[in-house]
Design a protein with these regions (language model features):
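Amphipathic, coiled-coil-like alpha-helical scaffolding segments used for oligomerization/assembly
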Residues: 96-158, 226-232
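Entry/capping segment at the start of metal-dependent catalytic domains
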Residues: 1-67, 234, 240
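Extracytoplasmic
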Residues: 32-35, 52-57, 66-74, 85, ...
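Flexible, polar/acidic helix-loop-strand segments at domain edges
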Residues: 29, 50, 130-211
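Extracytoplasmic/secreted envelope proteins and their assembly/folding machinery
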Residues: 54-56, 87, 91, 99-107, ...
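Solvent-exposed, acidic/flexible segments
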Residues: 30-36, 42, 49-53, 83, ...
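C-terminal solvent-exposed extensions
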Residues: 47, 78-82, 86, 222-274
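Second-shell loop/turn segments in exported
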Residues: 46-49, 88-96, 111-116, 164, ...
Length: 274
């Protein structure tokens, strides 16, 4: 059921018994201080929609005891088993069955124990970034040109980025920056998304703890999520400490991934059992 929360956002309950968490994984990690949350960025032109393909897929692994955060990006063209749909690009799982099937796909293919998620579209992402005052990012000239091309296609009143190098991006500009993929590779696109998220974390760390609740409520008003405001606020104390942030991409170099045409589409294929 989708419920409009008291903070102004959408809370969607998921069937936690149908998320593909194996008994072995549940027993192994169920009592640790590590929490894994799936983040999805959906590809939609409807500003108020949270449906469609998951154009961005990230797992945030939070170790409260060690104050460690891992940002694990899963490339959208990864070919995986999707329950009821055979082997396909992982980006399709969200379109087929929403967050539940997308989480189940991650758990079953990568031996995870994810039970919570947050989904945002790129329009809402722009609003979320603006809440924190934008981000400062070092961009290349190629990125600047493509950013302006995409932005102009989306919005005739788009504010162009006038120079490359270290620049301040508005929410709309940073959201478009996160979507660039034609000029290089999906790996480079994931790197851009991680840069934006790391900037947002740094921004949040410089906010007074007394404002955390208002910040979380404002941000969650822009998402569809299985979590409540108190659940998200339970991670806030980590912001006042030194956080270690590690970033990873799946498939990585050690996965021996091979890119190529499979069933008429370009995908990453690799041995998930290895």
């Amino acid at each position: 059921a989708l419920v409009f929360g008291m903070w102004g956002g959408f809370k969607k309950n998921v069937d936690k018994d149908n998320l593909g968490v194996s008994d072995d994984i549940a027993n192994k990690y169920g009592k640790t201080d590590i929490v894994n949350i799936a983040l999805f960025g959906v590809d939609t032109r409807d500003k108020d929609s949270f449906s469609g393909r998951s154009d961005s897929i990230m797992i945030v692994s939070i170790d409260k005891a060690k104050n460690d955060v891992k940002l694990i990006s899963v490339l959208r063209d990864s070919c995986v088993a999707i329950d009821g749909h055979g082997n396909q690009k992982i980006t399709h799982a969200y379109a087929y069955g929403g967050a539940e099937l997308a989480i189940k796909t991650l758990n079953q293919n990568f031996n995870m124990n994810i039970t919570d998620y947050a989904t945002i579209n790129f329009y809402k992402l722009a609003e979320a970034i603006d809440i924190l005052g934008g981000v400062d990012i070092d961009i290349t000239e190629d990125e600047r040109l493509e950013l302006n091309n995409i932005g102009d296609d989306d919005n005739p009143n788009f504010q162009y980025v006038e120079k490359s190098g270290m620049v301040h991006l508005t929410g709309e500009q940073a959201s478009v920056y996160s979507r660039i993929r034609k000029r290089d590779s999906d790996n480079a696109r994931v790197d851009r998304q991680k840069k934006v998220i790391e900037c947002l974390i740094d921004k949040a760390r410089n906010i007074s703890p007394t404002k955390y609740a208002d910040l979380v409520k404002a941000g969650m008003a822009l998402c569809e999520t299985s979590m409540s405001v108190p659940e998200v606020l339970s991670f806030a104390p980590m912001l006042s400490n030194d956080i270690t942030i590690e970033t990873m991409v799946v498939p990585g170099d050690e996965d021996n991934a091979v890119g190529g045409i499979y069933d008429g589409a370009w995908v990453w294929r690799y041995d998930l059992a290895a």
